[in-house]
Amino acid sequence: MLLLQALLFLLILPSHAEDDVTTTEELAPALVPPPKGTCAGWMAGIPGHPGHNGTPGRDGRDGTPGEKGEKGDAGLLGPKGETGDVGMTGAEGPRGFPGTPGRKGEPGEAAYVYRSAFSVGLETRVTVPNVPIRFTKIFYNQQNHYDGSTGKFYCNIPGLYYFSYHITVYMKDVKVSLFKKDKAVLFTYDQYQEKNVDQASGSVLLHLEVGDQVWLQVYGDGDHNGLYADNVNDSTFTGFLLYHDTN
């Protein structure tokens, strides 16, 4: 082995003779010193090929946050979106403050008041049974809806009417009935007490149509005709409209 190494050394020297002269001391470091021990005959091999790239290493740790940048410019206005669905009705809000009073309105038309009334009395005690009693003593008959010549009230305004009568009874019993359109609707009977003046009365509500007639008359024979009146005792018949029909 030593012989082979010396031979290689001699072969190397001529290749460098034409160049600069190199001493043995300068070349000595380039030679690998022979190993010692059991492998004293080892010789350096030819350098191998470069190895493959290793696997990528792990990602490094996150760096510290940078400083906040400056605010950017506002972007352009985007297109108008589609109309959304109608939302649910919200809760009722609190009651507002009262508003200021409005202006006074123009005067309205006066409502028309329907009037129909009469109040009459008996001037004589002479009456005929079974015919209308003619009350000729007029207390009130401004609308002239009562006719003293016939003793009848004639309806000119349809509606609800109130009728009443107060009869003085003397010398005989009395039977009086109130008629509407030839039909008795109310009856009053009073039995005379000797040496006394009695009173008989009655009242009723009736609905009348235009043209209806209402009156009083004594019914029965002459024995039941104690109807009486003088200058201190009256027998009266009264009626008036309460409500007129609106349709």
UniProtKB/Swiss-Prot annotation:
Q: What is this protein called?
A: Adiponectin
- Annotated PROSITE patterns: C1Q (PS50871)
Q: Which residues carry this modification: 5-hydroxylysine?
A: K36, K68, K71, K80, K104
Organism in which the protein naturally occurs: Mus musculus
Where does this protein reside within or beyond the cell? Secreted
Q: In which tissues is it expressed?
A: Synthesized exclusively by adipocytes and secreted into plasma.
S-(2-succinyl)cysteine occurs at C39
Disordered as annotated region, ranges: 44-105
Q: Tell me the residues on which 4-hydroxyproline occurs.
A: P47, P50, P56, P94
User: Which GO biological process annotations does it have?
Assistant: adiponectin-activated signaling pathway; brown fat cell differentiation; cellular response to insulin stimulus; cellular response to xenobiotic stimulus; detection of oxidative stress; fatty acid beta-oxidation; fatty acid oxidation; gene expression
Q: In this chain's numbering, which residues are marked as the site (Not glycosylated)?
A: N233
Q: Where is the composition biased (Basic and acidic residues)?
A: 58-73
What does the UniProt induction comment state? During hormone-induced adipose differentiation and activated by insulin.
* Job description of the protein: Important adipokine involved in the control of fat metabolism and insulin sensitivity, with direct anti-diabetic, anti-atherogenic and anti-inflammatory activities. Stimulates AMPK phosphorylation and activation in the liver and the skeletal muscle, enhancing glucose utilization and fatty-acid combustion. Antagonizes TNF-alpha by negatively regulating its expression in various tissues such as liver and macrophages, and also by counteracting its effects. Inhibits endothelial NF-kappa-B signaling through a cAMP-dependent pathway.
**Which of this chain's residues carry glycans?**
T23, T24, K68, K71, K80, K104
Collagen-like domain boundaries: 45-110
Q: How is this chain modified after translation?
A: HMW complexes are more extensively glycosylated than smaller oligomers. Hydroxylation and glycosylation of the lysine residues within the collagen-like domain of adiponectin seem to be critically involved in regulating the formation and/or secretion of HMW complexes and consequently contribute to the insulin-sensitizing activity of adiponectin in hepatocytes. O-glycosylated. Not N-glycosylated O-linked glycans on hydroxylysine residues consist of Glc-Gal disaccharides bound to the oxygen atom of post-translationally added hydroxyl groups. O-linked glycosylation in the N-terminal is disialylated with the structure Neu5Acalpha2->8Neu5Acalpha2->3Gal. Sialylated by alpha 2,8-sialyltransferase III.
